């Protein structure tokens, strides 16, 4: 059996401009400013093999979805004046960009949808994740325990957003999992033993918890053992917390769902 490719050589990039999408479809290239702070590694080291585009609300009926992708041919660093020679007196003319060139874009038979409107800059993932994704959250390729936890909550029909961005006055936070409830939202973090249990990261996590709590979030943290050896108990904590905060929000039908404690089946209540 062939070994599954686990390299993050597939990039889903933000597409928030119709003229840029026209360039992507007609001229087969996309640009990223070299000054971008969160530059995908696969772009910087030129190992990117595929690129897809996440459309924002400007695309109307195609908003918040991934519908097009292409195979990357070349990545180069060029100045803006080379990308847009027709623009005169451009104050950004000397700015440098990664120019990602690709084969003709291919339209997916069925789009990958985000149920909740989200602004996503980049998702670095694998071709396998892209092939199997039905929802935008399926695209994310996290740590092994994050992947295991995602499969577990999907099986239990617990709707969550992965790598959900919280922008505060102090800094940006990406939540491993965000669950939206009627009374209070829940942040779930999967704490790998090696990283999160070191002294410096324990202090960082406590500070992070305090900031999120002040914003009204409830935080649950689970270790590798919680997820790999005690997943049934861990999911029980999650369901109890959801029930405590008024049920989980279901975007598609604007309802809230509770979980029964006796048989783990979902009960639906409309508000």
Where are these regions (language model features)?
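Generic domain-boundary/flexible-linker signal
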Residues: 81, 113, 188, 198-199, ...
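Residue-identity detector for glycine
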Residues: 70, 128, 142, 192, ...
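Arginine residue identity/basic-tract feature
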Residues: 8, 22, 31, 67, ...
